[in-house]
């Protein structure tokens, strides 16, 4: 009835949204939330106006706009066709690809650069004091600095790209389009690097869409430009010497952090990335302990609990899980980890591993933050909170039973080959981009690759 009164008051159109900032993930739904997650709301509004025969002030049906993860042309089109809404509203999908509408209209859906719902650039950068950007579109927010069309290379070069993750792919695509002869080498049988592994859980469907987009762009670029791709190829110094490239771009990722915990030899131990690729290694393991409460650890926990029905515990030595992640994404995942029965232990240090469990020192003080709190920390890491209370220590030693221990402690930049190439002068120009330069997110990997590719 409130909406009916608004129509009488002169409202011409309704944007039907959901959520408030007590649950950050609803006002701007992150990765993991279903496509078209708020369509039920717009449908309810449309049915209300139809049932009560309420017309707009111009005598037509009251227009209702749907919003919320509608950057999928098939779902957006179906919502309008089925009468669930009259229009759809897009925001983040247009940051990822300003030509979304034109490509959808032309039927070139595979060429739409998809939003991955990470909110690394559009929300997090803004919160940290910057301006809205985009993890998958480096031009967003920098349109004056980077023209829409690439400037042709002044001197065409033979370039080798070592590594087929998001950084290597982004560089290869742009450099080839600018006229360089580019050869990309990938040691595995598929492209994608860390995003290929990270897109395995069902909730990571947005990342899978992005990977499919990159693969499609590579196919088109190989057909139209001087781009060659060699998968299942390990690059050596000898190979680079033999080819005599003008430039070599290293983009081969990180080394996994594997601390020398006491008892690691006897423990049933596996890296989180290895388990994602080989879930059969968790067969027979009911109680699983994950060491590391970053994004990989928490997403792996959700995957194990929801797709394989495992009892999962995640250990994190810091006060908060997934530090640095956008509050919406972080809160959404924490909320569903709690609903899935995943045990989160923060302020917990691993002391030793055993065949049947993990020995830890856990701070059980009442001042330790609630690990399931979806809105803490309240302020970004670059702004100190004067109201934040100090965490006191009440350390308790305990053993957490485990049939399988999963290490998800992140990785560090693997610069070994880069420095070796420099010492041996394997090319006139040698660069290091992506995680092999500095372990980071899709945002940093794509941005760094783009900045180099447009000027080399």
Task: For every predicted segment, state its role.
Residues 1-162, 166, 170-182, 190, ...:
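Flavin-dependent oxidoreductase catalytic cores
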């Amino acid at each position: 009835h409130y909406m009916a009164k608004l129509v009488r008051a002169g409202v011409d159109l309704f944007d039907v949204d959901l959520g408030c900032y007590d649950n950050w993930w609803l006002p701007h739904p992150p990765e993991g939330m279903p496509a078209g997650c708020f369509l039920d709301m717009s449908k309810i509004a449309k049915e209300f106006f139809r049932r009560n025969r309420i017309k707009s002030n111009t005598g037509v049906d009251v227009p209702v706009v749907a919003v919320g993860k509608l950057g999928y042309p098939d779902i957006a089109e179906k919502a309008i066709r089925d009468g669930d809404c009259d229009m759809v509203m897009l925001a983040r999908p247009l940051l990822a690809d300003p030509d979304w509408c034109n490509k959808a209209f032309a039927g070139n859906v595979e060429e739409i650069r998809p939003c991955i719902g990470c909110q690394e650039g559009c929300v997090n950068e803004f919160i940290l004091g910057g301006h809205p950007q985009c993890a998958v579109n480096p031009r967003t927010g920098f349109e004056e600095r980077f023209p829409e069309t690439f400037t042709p290379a002044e001197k065409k070069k033979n370039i080798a790209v070592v590594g087929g993750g998001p950084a290597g792919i982004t560089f290869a695509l742009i450099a080839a389009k600018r006229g360089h002869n580019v050869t990309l080498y990938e040691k595995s049988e598929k492209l994608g690097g860390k995003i290929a592994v990270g897109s395995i859980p069902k909730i990571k469907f947005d990342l899978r869409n992005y990977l499919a987009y990159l693969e499609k762009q590579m196919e088109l670029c190989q057909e139209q430009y001087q781009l060659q791709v060699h998968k299942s190829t390990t690059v050596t110094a000898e190979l680079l010497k033999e080819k005599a490239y003008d430039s070599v771009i290293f983009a081969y990722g990180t080394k996994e952090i594997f601390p020398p915990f006491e008892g690691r030899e006897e423990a049933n131990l596996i890296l989180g990335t290895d388990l994602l690729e080989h879930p059969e290694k968790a067969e027979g393991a009911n109680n699983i302990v994950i060491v590391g409460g970053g994004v990989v650890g928490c997403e792996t926990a959700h995957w194990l609990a929801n797709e394989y029905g495992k009892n999962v515990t995640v250990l994190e030595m810091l006060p908060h899980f997934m530090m640095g992640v956008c509050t919406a994404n972080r809160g959404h995942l924490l909320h569903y980890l709690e609903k899935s029965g995943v045990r989160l232990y923060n302020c917990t240090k691993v002391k030793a591993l055993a065949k049947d469990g993990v020995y830890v020192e856990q701070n059980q003080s009442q001042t330790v933050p609630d690990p399931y709190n979806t809105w803490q920390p309240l302020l970004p890491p670059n702004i100190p909170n004067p109201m934040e209370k100090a965490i006191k220590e009440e350390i308790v030693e305990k053993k957490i039973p485990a049939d399988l221990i999963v290490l998800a402690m992140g990785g560090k930049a693997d610069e070994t080959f880069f420095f070796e190439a420099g010492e041996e002068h394997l090319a006139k120009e040698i660069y290091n981009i992506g995680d092999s330069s500095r372990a980071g997110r899709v945002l940093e990997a794509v941005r760094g690759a783009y900045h180099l590719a447009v000027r080399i």
